[in-house]
Amino acid sequence: FLPATRATPKELLPIYDTPALQFVIDEAAQAGCTRVVIVTSRAKPSIENYASAASTDKVAVSVVYQDSPLGLGHAVTCAHQAVGNEPFLVLLPDEIMGDASLTKQLIALYEKSGKSSIGLKRVAVAEVSNYGNVKVASGASDASSTDSSVAILQVVEKPKPADAVSDIVIIGRYVLSPKVFEKLEQIKPSSNGELQLTDALAMLASENALVGVVSEITRYDTGTPMGLLRAVIEIALERKDIGPQLNSWLKEKFNK
């Protein structure tokens, strides 16, 4: 996203007129959260400034720092003191969902099962190397029903397509038990020095303590240029203030 991210962190790049980070804050609030903790770098003071302005009477937004970019598992560990020993959500701001329905489902699944619950989707096997890949309980991987809950047996970080354990992958929505902090303390850094959250999830899966929801929710991967552009266009099309005009312009543009 250079040169834009020299001036604006990727998390604050606008999706039409709303920063990507705000979508995640709003999603958390819609799911019933009253407190949002943003894990960020000290090199991004604009995120702390944004967090201060984003707090409302319904949701308090604060910041904790990850001094080195040592992976998602490390980022979760940085929030341990703020979270305490309570279950918590992890929402990745480079994945914007069409609404809060998946997050609400994960919360309900956690409350029912008492197990860490994660968002899942199906992809072509050729794409699994871009995601954490999961093996689910027998029969569930062939389920055709939309938004089905599954027991997770195995978690593999970005396997080659030939090594895929299924066509089901992890997307950036998690409801985690505080037990995950114990697992994060036990895992070893990967070859690039990062602590992978998937390694901790794999330990939970081995203890029958991990479940998920296979969802068909609308999802925008704003961590890629094409994903960001798609999000801007599709979300703007849904807006009453600009959608009709944009729709007319697109039809005019592409009907030439």
Model-derived features with residue positions:
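Conserved N-terminal catalytic core of the sugar/cofactor nucleotidyltransferase
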Residues: 13-14, 18-90, 96-101
